[in-house]
Amino acid sequence: AGFPFFTEFEIFDRHCSKIKNTEHKLDYVSICTPNYLHDAHIRYSLRLGADVICEKPLVLNPWNIDQLSKIEKETGHHINTILQLRLHDSIVNLKKKVDASSENKIFDVDLTYITSRGNWYYTSWKGDIHKSGGISTNIGVHFYDMLQWIFGKVTRNVVHVMSHDRCAGYLEFQKA
């Protein structure tokens, strides 16, 4: 029969109210909504008594993470996030090579990602920095996560350019 899918929060809320009074319960809520709604949808889902699977970014403002941690403790439910680049075969293989290298090996990495965004992008929530978090949060987070997962913790971070449609800088990791 599949799982219910909702494009409107109000209908999802109604669905949750209906099943709350049955023997069924929500184990997980998967949140795939615009970035600026994640925080409220995570809070709602935890308070419903469900664990959460949320696409990136969990929140737009780092200070909201502390409150989400408190709600996790209060409810006993957990938040999980998805950063799918870690699952690509080529990325998994690269991580294995880096992990197998000598402990002192420092890699030289140049990552450039260029993609065009049509007018749709700038007229949608994705083009609004207050709703998406900007290009670094909306798109760059995948690359930051991938690089940190492969090469270790960030030891240096310098931003050279930051605008609505581009970001450039220098990142140094434990192994790159």
Predicted features by range, described:
Residues Y28, A40, Q67, D89, ...:
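Alpha-helical elements of Rossmann-like donor-binding domains used by nucleotide-donor carbohydrate transfer enzymes
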Residues Y170-K175:
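Active-site beta-strand termini and strand-to-loop segments that position acidic
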Residues T155-S163:
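Conserved S-adenosyl-L-methionine
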Residues L85-R156:
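Predominantly a Rossmann-like dinucleotide-binding segment in NAD(P)-dependent oxidoreductases
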Residues P4-S69:
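Beta-loop-alpha module in the N-terminal Rossmann-like domain of NAD(P)-dependent dehydrogenases
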Residues I31, V52-E55, I79-I82, V158-V159:
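Short catalytic-loop micro-motif centered on adjacent basic/acidic residues
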Residues I65-L85, E103-D110:
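Rossmann-fold dehydrogenase core element
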